[in-house]
C-alpha cells in the first residue's frame, strides 16, 4: 500500500495539525532586534544556533556560576483577561535575576520559554520585547529561548512563560548571610507593586469585589497598578556591593516578608520588622480592605511595598541608604537583627 496521497487528495501538513512554522519564523525575525539590544561582553553566539555560547570574563579569579529559574504565575491570567502583554516579560526576567542577585551574582545571560496552543506573533513579540527590556535593565544578554506551539495544550489566547538566568560571583564574595549578627540593620527597598506573587489572591479579591479596573486609582488606572512590572534591583545593588559590605539580601517573592527574610538568616537570629517604618502602598491597602485580609496573611503573601531586603552592619546603614537613594531607589530602615528566643519565628512584624 502506498503511503503517498492518491491523485486528487491533498496530503496533511504541520499547519493542518495546528502548528504554523511560518508564524514561528516570523516571530524570530521580529524579536532579533530586541535581543540584539541586550548583547554584552561575553556573548559569542546567541539566538539562532542550537546552543548559545558565553565566555566568562577574565576579571573573575574564582568565578562561581549562580543560576535561577522562575515563571510569572497566575498574573498571566490577568494579562489574558485584560489583553495586555507588555509587562509580563519584565516580570519574568525580574523573578530570576533578582533571585541570583541576592547571592552577589552579576546576571550574565537569560533564556526564555514561551509555550502556547496557537502562536499569535504580535502577542508573543510583545511579551519577548518585555523580556528584552528586563534584560537591558539587568545588564544581561537575552541569549536564546524556545517558542513552543502545542495545539490543544493551551486554550486559545493563553500561554505560559518560564525564564532562566545565569550569573557569576567571585567565590570569596558570595553573599550567604553567614556574617549576619544581632545589631545589624534591615533595609527595605520599595517595590513597584505586587510584583509577580500573590496573584491567585489578587484575582480572588477582584472576583469578589468586582471593581472597575479602568477606574482612576491614585492617578493611574487600577489595572495599571495591578499589572505594574516587577522592579529589577540588579544595577543599584551590584553598585552597593562594590561600595560596602552587604551581609545578606532577600528577594521578597512568594511567601512575602515573613517567609523570605528567614532564608538568609542563621537559626540563632531573628529579623524584627517595624510596620510603621514605611507606609503600606495604596494597592496593598486596597487589596487588604477589599479582601478583608488579615495583617499576618498580608505579610506572608505579599511584599507589602518592600521588594528587596538588604542587611548591613549598623555603622554602614546610613551610607547604604544614601547610596541607594542616589541610584534612584526608595529605601527605608525597616528593622534590625536580634538574638532569637526559643520557639520564636525568624521574622516578625511588629
From Swiss-Prot:
Subcellular location: Cytoplasm
Pfam families: AIRS (PF00586), AIRS_C (PF02769)
Pathway: Purine metabolism; IMP biosynthesis via de novo pathway; 5-amino-1-(5-phospho-D-ribosyl)imidazole from N(2)-formyl-N(1)-(5-phospho-D-ribosyl)glycinamide: step 2/2
Gene3D superfamilies on file: PurM-like C-terminal domain, PurM-like, N-terminal domain
SUPFAM superfamilies to which the protein is assigned, alphabetical: PurM C-terminal domain-like, PurM N-terminal domain-like
Family to which this protein belongs: Belongs to the AIR synthase family.
Gene Ontology terms, MF aspect: ATP binding; phosphoribosylamine-glycine ligase activity; phosphoribosylformylglycinamidine cyclo-ligase activity
Keywords tagged on the record: ATP-binding, Cytoplasm, Ligase, Nucleotide-binding, Purine biosynthesis
Cellular component terms (Gene Ontology): cytosol
GO biological process, one term: 'de novo' IMP biosynthetic process
Protein name in the entry: Phosphoribosylformylglycinamidine cyclo-ligase
Organism of derivation: Cupriavidus taiwanensis (strain DSM 17343 / BCRC 17206 / CCUG 44338 / CIP 107171 / LMG 19424 / R1)
